[in-house]
Amino acid sequence: MVLKNFILSGLVSVVCVGSLQAAEDVDIAATDPTELATKAWVALKAGDHELVSELTTQCFEEFGDDAVRQQKESGEEISKENASSFPELNSVGTCLFILAESLSQQGYDEKCQATLKKLITDFPECHCANKQGYYWKPAMAAEKRLAE
């Protein structure tokens, strides 16, 4: 239980694979998938749920098709050694997790659960790295969250 709470509470401070240093001034015009995910984490940490929604929607619209293709075509298991080869998959999956957390914080539990289920079903192999470089799988965290 302590580990589960630690993982869930610590997720807000993690940064997506290949993340860039986030500036204080979040510019939604970013077109790099990892930058969008990083900025979405920053917005979530700041409690800016409207910006989380905008950034995650932009990520889905611009990179969703590529993420689906990467998930389907990744005949190999994605691991920490090759995770950076799948930036769209990692960013879209991570953005789903961020969006679910934002929805939960706003009290939209049913939407949160639906978003977590979509992450588990559509992007089970996405990876994310924390600031220390340790990888975790948002889909696994989503499964734990749904089991609560």
Task: Give the residues covered by each predicted segment.
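Acidic, Ser/Thr- and Gly/Pro-rich intrinsically disordered linkers and low-complexity segments
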Residues: 66-87, 132
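Alpha-helical junction/boundary sensor with strong preference for TPR arrays
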Residues: 62-70, 122-130
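Residue signature of alpha-solenoid helical repeat architecture, marking inter-repeat boundaries
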Residues: 28-31, 85-86, 90-92, 137
